[in-house]
């Protein structure tokens, strides 16, 4: 479960062009609790999960840390924050937290949701939970459904841009941002919402 202080904090107030130095002076990835998507999604852009982590990246990883916005391709305007520390990667976007890698409280794979609400019962939303692994292969971050299934997402750098290949076949080129845009501080509801009782 994500640290409540992380969810209560204002991650939109930070400058994401000022990245932590990964010099082994602080915590290791495995020392920090796992960050999962709370319920069907967070209510406000949260603080970084790995802010106290300074473990260097493994040789097979590229450094894609920071805040990114889609500028061309399938998901123009999409904004996501990528954190990395050691072998751990956290992608935070649109109400969702994808956290993969060694941690102090849970398994390696992500424990999150696609974001759409299957139904609401007595005012409480219920979403289908999902899981994926994030594996570095030749400086490309590949997401595999459930940790053993097909590759559904790829992220890699081309020059100063981040390239995001998604399961729907789209390819999005992304630029680096320093600040969270106002319209991305509070996530928009995703998918259907069916009220049962």
Predicted regions located by residue number:
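A broad, low-specificity signal marking well-ordered, structured residues that form hydrophobic/aromatic
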Residues: 80, 141, 172
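Amphipathic/hydrophobic helical signal segments and adjacent flexible N-terminal regions
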Residues: 1-88, 92-95, 111-114, 178-197
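Loop/turn residues immediately N-terminal
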Residues: 150, 169-170
């Amino acid at each position: 479960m994500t640290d409540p202080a992380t969810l209560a904090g204002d991650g939109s107030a930070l400058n994401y062009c000022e990245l932590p130095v990964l010099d082994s002076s602080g915590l290791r990835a495995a020392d920090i609790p796992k960050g999962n998507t709370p319920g069907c999604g967070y209510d406000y852009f949260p603080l970084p999960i790995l802010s106290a982590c300074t473990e260097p990246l493994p040789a097979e990883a590229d450094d894609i840390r920071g805040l990114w916005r889609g500028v061309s391709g399938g998901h123009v305007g999409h904004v996501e924050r990528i954190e990395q520390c050691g072998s751990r990667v956290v992608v935070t976007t649109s109400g969702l937290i994808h956290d993969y890698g060694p941690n102090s409280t849970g398994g390696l794979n992500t424990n999150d949701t696609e974001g759409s609400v299957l139904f609401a019962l007595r005012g409480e939303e219920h979403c289908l939970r999902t899981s994926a692994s994030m594996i570095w292969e030749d400086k490309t971050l590949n997401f595999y459904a459930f940790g053993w299934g097909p590759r559904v997402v790829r992220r890699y750098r081309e020059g100063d841009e981040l390239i995001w290949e998604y399961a729907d076949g789209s390819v999005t080129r992304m630029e680096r941002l320093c600040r969270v845009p106002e319209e991305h501080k509070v996530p928009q509801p995703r998918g259907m919402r069916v009220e049962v009782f």
